[in-house]
């Protein structure tokens, strides 16, 4: 049996296919979903969602949101998402390095809003790099 997975952002549908299994970056850790999973609603962290439509796994960078599992359908509603295959690994690596430096700089100061923004940007850059297949 398979699961129908839809990844939806405010702008578009990023993924709408059947998969054998998927792994979600929930706020409590990685969450594996197979067919006939119990109904579930979970918050998602910024990270990499992995789907296996056939033999091979595919990565999707997700920028936080929610996932609902019910009746072999998974709806993933996120602030942003990109297929790993569409992300340029080199530019993702450069963005990650820049975000890492900005986070280190922000953490030296006392400006909490700036620290939170830098941390969020770092998580997004890390998710994009990992989805593109780059090591962090």
UniProtKB/Swiss-Prot annotation:
Its main location: membrane. It is found in: Cellular thylakoid membrane. Disulfide bonds: none annotated. SUPFAM superfamilies: Epsilon subunit of F1F0-ATP synthase N-terminal domain. One of its GO terms (molecular function) is proton-transporting ATP synthase activity, rotational mechanism. Keywords: ATP synthesis, CF(1), Hydrogen ion transport, Ion transport, Membrane, Thylakoid, Transport. GO terms for cellular component: plasma membrane; plasma membrane-derived thylakoid membrane; proton-transporting ATP synthase complex. The keyword Transferase does not apply. InterPro entries: ATP_synth_F1_dsu/esu, ATP_synth_F1_dsu/esu_N, ATP_synth_F1_esu_C, ATPsynth_dsu/esu_N. Residues 105-114 have a biased composition (Basic and acidic residues). The keyword Kinase does not apply. Residues 100-120 are annotated as: Disordered. Produces ATP from ADP in the presence of a proton gradient across the membrane. F-type ATPases have 2 components, CF(1) - the catalytic core - and CF(0) - the membrane proton channel. CF(1) has five subunits: alpha(3), beta(3), gamma(1), delta(1), epsilon(1). CF(0) has three main subunits: a, b and c. Belongs to the ATPase epsilon chain family. NCBIfam families: ATP_synt_epsi. This is ATP synthase epsilon chain. It comes from Synechocystis sp. (strain ATCC 27184 / PCC 6803 / Kazusa).
